[in-house]
Amino acid sequence: MMQRISLLLVLATLTACAQDDDALLEEVRDTLPAASEVRLDVPSTDNKSTLGAVAEFYQHTRNTSDFLNAASVVWVGLIQTIMRYPATSVEGDTITWGPWNDDSALRPFAYKLVAVRTGDRSITYSLSGKRRADAGDFIPLIEGAAERPDAGERGKGTLTLLFDNQAVIDVAKRERGSIAIRYDLTGEPRTNAVTFSDFVNERGEGPRDSEYGYLQRADGSGRFDFLTLANVDEDAAGQAENLHIVSNWDATGAGRSDVAAWGGNLGEVIWNVAQCWDASFLATFTSYAATGGAQPLLANEGDAASCAVSGETVAPLL
């Protein structure tokens, strides 16, 4: 009789442990970010017909958001893919997946994902990797922390992309430095902040530090404040200029960019540009002002009354 009771107690304990493991696994899967939570949703021309040239500074806004999305969404998607597989081990509050192999013959990498519960619906996680042929240790590629108030609700958190380490396992990677992303979808509006540290892009430009701020309201309107490089003066073969761009748009996608441009071929001159676009992303108004040169410049194209949103004062980040 005692032997039977002991066996039942063992089975009950094993069942409880399995249930705890399943609950932790479900909590981690639910808490870590989905790609949609880190993506910057700038209005798109994808589903609209555009007859004419797309507004230049709308295009800079879209290109920058596309770059940031490419840098983060792919990696978040990889984490979500790994978590669809059974966990390799569960020890206390720690879950490990891996080593997990990328199935593509052209990407011979192995990954390991470790997630640790640090509080009620609070998770820290690290995705590490190495080349499958190497005998060395896994090195961190992404580190993050995530919170979600309740299952199914919108969350918040941070994740950092470590490009120096990514280049160690993938020699084709040309980016260096790090990108840290802070996202918060728990309030209105949703916000994303992105910090570049010692970042070198795929063209070898950098290293540089910069901050990006994004918000999106429930109706689809939003704001994106960012720094980029582009050749905007008349010398097509010249150096790229620094652009500080603040873009705002309404629920239809119509919007306005306020821009400060400096450096490159501009020398001591600072340009301030305001450009408005309609719901098809075609420019409806552009104003140019240049200061610091021998002759100040002020010119307007189009109708200022066509601007769907108000402008902001934007200064160069000298």
Feature-to-residue mapping (PLM):
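Short helix-loop boundary/capping segments
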Residues: 141-250
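Hydrophilic extracytoplasmic domains
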Residues: 252-318
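Intrinsically disordered, low-complexity regions enriched in Ser/Pro/Gly/Gln/His and often acidic
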Residues: 68, 88-90, 242, 255, ...
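Sec-dependent bacterial lipoprotein signal peptides
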Residues: 1-15
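N-terminal "mature head" segments of proteins
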Residues: 17-121, 288-318
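Hydrophobic residues embedded in beta-strands of well-ordered beta-sheets
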Residues: 95, 122-125, 157, 190-192, ...
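Short acidic, glycine-rich loop/turn motifs
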Residues: 99-104, 129-133, 165, 198-203, ...
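Short N-terminal edge-element motif at the start of the domain
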Residues: 78-176
